[in-house]
Amino acid sequence: MKIRTHEHHLDLLGTSSGYRSPGLHMSEIYNHYYQRADPKRYRGGAFDLVRMEAGSALEVVLENALSSRMAGERPGEFQTEEGIWFSPDIIAFEGKILVLGEIKATWMSCREVPVSPDQSKLTGVPSNWDGTSIATFPKQFDKYFTQIKCYAYHLRTPYARLYIYFVNGNWSPPTPVFLCWDLEFTAHELTEEWTAMKRHAQKVMKVI
């Protein structure tokens, strides 16, 4: 058997998931914000780019599978009144309610996220939440929620659904786990988050 290396030609800058209009994108703003806030965590590097590419590939597969089940679709790009582009994973209507769907794949542990009794059976983690009351995620998930709240603000909906594929589950042992949460934000939460990101774009990045 002869074996030779082969270049995979994957786009390790994460720009291959679809057409991007020229101009400022929402992801540039919140990525810049978190890189400044926690440079050690968001420092980048070759290994992080490989993980990003793998995560993006998983997200595309999940997006295609979930969009039909949610009676939704990937809607393409939206643009804010400031001229900022953003691309939700899924937009679905449940009756007259618009639901923003966001899909993530991560190597972080599911051990500290809100886990309902039913989810506990999937994760192997003791339940820490009843499944309906107010709950919070660990700080390391903040960037997910910044993205979701900014998108929801501009879509004028308080409703979102977050899907997370935990590649290594709770790490004890490393086993994939797929979890989902319905989210409902207050108008204040959405406005506060977008105001902070807009201020960062204006005062720090100086791009709007």
Region locations from a protein language model:
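Metal-dependent nuclease catalytic cores that hydrolyze phosphodiester bonds in DNA/RNA
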Residues: 1-100, 105-129
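Nucleic-acid nuclease catalytic cores
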Residues: 76-205
